[in-house]
Amino acid sequence: CIRDSTYINDISADSRYLLFSTSDRVYTSLPHSRNSLYKLDLQTMAIDTIWEKAPYVNQAAFSPDGKQLLVAGAGDAFDGIGRNIKQGQISNSYDGQLFLYDLASRKASPLTKDFNPNVIDAVWNRFNGQIYILCEDEDYQRIYTCDPANGKIKQVAASEDIIMSYALADNAPVLFYYGQSASNANRLYAYDLKGGKNRLVYDLSQDKLKDIALGEVHDWNFKSDDGTTIQGRYYLPPHFDPNKKYPMIVYYYGGTSPTNRALEMRYSMHMYAALGYVVYTLNPSGTTGFGQEFAARHVNAWGLKTADEIIQGTKLFCKEHSFVNEKKIGCIGASYGGFMTQYLQTRTDIFAAAISHAGISALSSYWGEGYWGYGYCSVANAGTYPWNAPEFFTKQSPLFNADKINTPLLLLHGNADTNVPIGESIQMFAALKILGKTVEFVQVDGENHGIVGYQKRIGWQNTIYAWFAKWLKDEPEWWKALYPDRTL
């Protein structure tokens, strides 16, 4: 195996012990990363090995008295004692769990096995002995408290939908956090742990949004064909008129992370709405934050259930909302969402325009390419490889179904992408050109998986807006101005 790195995990309350871990890469079995944990006595420099090359554990922290550890990992950690999935399912190890580990007995016990939210971070507070957990809770990001004595978990009544970060005092009953919601930017609060009261410390949102009009945001859920409730929401344009017909944009990730309610994000749904679109987003099967069973649906799926839910949700939304022009629906996603964009077009013709940013077109090439390919696929298609399931790798790849695509498709990609290499878009572009389909391909020079250069980001955003204007509003002028016809 190859040792990747060493990490400091925690320092004990009395400052005597240092908890550190090492990460080792193992190619020949799952998971490909194994962690070892050590306790270093800073007085004697003696090292106590807690565990070696353990799978599915991430990091650990001391309890206030130093007798236990709070361990973050996946449900499969510690021989699966935290696993809570159906028979026949494979765990999605991106779904985070917490465990208590007794240093004397060297035994672990699950804390969050029956707790649906996905654990992002946790702190064992020295002041009151409670554990504070930041987690994805459906499309919210919330803080919960857990009593380690009895395992009871309660929600902290924070004032924002998305808690971005938090900090606890060691010697006072106070928690500071900042966050945002679907229609406001970040605000900073102090929370009284005893009284349960929030006090606004600073409102950055007021300054940011003082000259901006936002449309309304509404929740909208539906039951899929198998009876699962699929959660979503929609954004209306400012000055919305229910008697008009609006084009609609459907946004999704479709992978293992939820599309949360944050105002500020790379794919701003309020921004699309401000341009005169209704925007519908949803969190289909496989998303974390909805319980381990729901998250496990992501494994070895690659669009199988997800596409059905996106198509069904889009059709039902149009049926129930007469203000949507069902002939003018666009869709957009990035990375796994870019894969979903491409895959959806092989399954349906309900979209009038589609955009794939950094999308995966062939599982067989992505699996072995990029910095994340085989590592991400060790979860997304655990145990499934090109040599033991060649039909799966072709059947679920948009490239191998390119002849079924009829929707005008825009492919966007940074040409320095180390996650999903640009070849994924190049080969889909080549296929669709050979097939005589409507496709455009825009490379962003020097950009990686996300477009972060300021001027390049503006150009990238305008490209998206212009593509939708061309196909959903019958206004091609913006696109022509950006990309005039050329004769070689």
Q: Can you name each region flagged by the protein language model?
A:
Residues 41-45, 102-106, 147-151, 193-196:
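Short loop/turn segments that connect beta-strands within beta-propeller blades
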Residues 13-14, 64-65, 126-128, 170-171:
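Residue-level detector of Asp-centered blade-edge/turn motifs that repeat once per structural unit
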Residues 274, 281-488:
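Active-site-proximal cap/loop segments of hydrolase catalytic domains
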Residues 3, 7-10, 15, 19-22, ...:
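Non-catalytic accessory segments flanking enzyme active sites
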Residues 244-254:
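Short beta-strand element of the alpha/beta-hydrolase
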Residues 253-269, 284, 423-424:
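The serine-hydrolase catalytic nucleophile loop
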Residues 3-6, 21-37, 51-61, 71-99, ...:
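A flexible loop/linker signature enriched in serine peptidases of the S9 family
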